[in-house]
């Protein structure tokens, strides 16, 4: 996509605090397991790259002073379970999980520290006791901030004349997807919008869901990470455009599929921060005492090409972060 076709507004990242004392035995090369959610490093794309950069930021080089064992379950529940067990059997020092893999990582071990990434509701998912004091062997980084939902809806209302009805794509099998629906409905009611849920449990169910939205005369649809299968990110933009529905996304990667607008936490930034907690744990910190970190960098994108195809005129001066 050409630069002039979208606008980017970026927030700032915050420090994650002081280091702790050395705890790894001298000369021991730490082994880190990484349980992804897609089927390959190529599919993970910017997230895979960001995690590697995060380790390099701290002086870790894979194969030299750290060993990274990657597993790619391709969003298959049975593969999540098997691969989490594989990593534990390797006697890793820390298990890093991405997205829905966190629950499988937690169930696989009660002794190996687990650092999760991109989990919207770690308390509701029973990963931690609280955000401030996680307890147990699990901590990590959430990608959810409730105030983002209201801002997305406000942006849509400013951009789309006469907006009154919004669809939300929901995966009923994922608890966090239902959480997003509840928060969206609450935020929408405060500004006079109604929200209708449309379900999709897999990539195959996405097209029928968008057909149902069009039949119901939905003007816009909001999506969240848990409501869209990872492999479905690349097609939802075209599904929305072809049905003349404005898509409001949550990340740069989803935006690039053709969404009208995206506003949310930078998932790449979260992946790049995760090694900081791995480093702290290797140096003696306990996961139970490391608070769950919220997002600190936010991104907004407006796609002028998509707006034109939908017959919308974007007044840049009216949009506020």
Model-found features: residue ranges?
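Short hydrophobic alpha-helices and adjacent helix-cap/hinge residues
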Residues: 1-320
